[in-house]
Amino acid sequence: MAMPDLTHDLTGKLLIAMPGMEDPRFAGAVIFLCVHSPGQAMGLIINKPMEEITFTELMEQLDIPKRGSTPQVPVCFGGPVDMRRGFVLHSPDYAPRGEEALRIDHRFAMTGTLDILEDIAAGRGPKRSLLALGYAGWGEGQLEAEIARNDWLTADATPELVFDHKMERKWDAAVQSLGFDPLMLSSEAGHA
């Protein structure tokens, strides 16, 4: 079977797990793709909350003092790779000190330094953000093969879907953004 041409850049798009996803880490997942190139892909799961820790508890563990009322930034299971590392997906209005944020497009940026957590705790962070612990990563051709196998749907990301929807509603909202009802999806895929 010939592999479809999936060489276009999916950076800034969403991956939506199909109902038949067998890997429990990705079942029901919505992943924001931060980087996609022919050699690799990296994304953050944006709809699986970390039950074990809140943003406030994480700030306490990192000895980051809170000034006033610390916003309750959602903390997500970002993926199974390097779960001790955190990434903040945020609106591009934030300019980090020192290192540059990875500007994904005109609506999204990502920062992986402690500075952003300190700034959020101090009330100087981005207007919109979520924190992901860990990430999802793919090697050369791996993501393209998974998409061709119908493991994932792709959709446009919007700040409203990424930052404003409740985590438990993001999968449904992402599917609905494609123009159909999530109940119409089958766990079985076919090829003509």
Swiss-Prot record:
This is UPF0301 protein Jann_3896. It holds the Pfam family DUF179. InterPro entries: AlgH-like. It comes from Jannaschia sp. (strain CCS1). One of its GO terms (cellular component) is cytosol. Belongs to the UPF0301 (AlgH) family. It comes from the Bacteria.
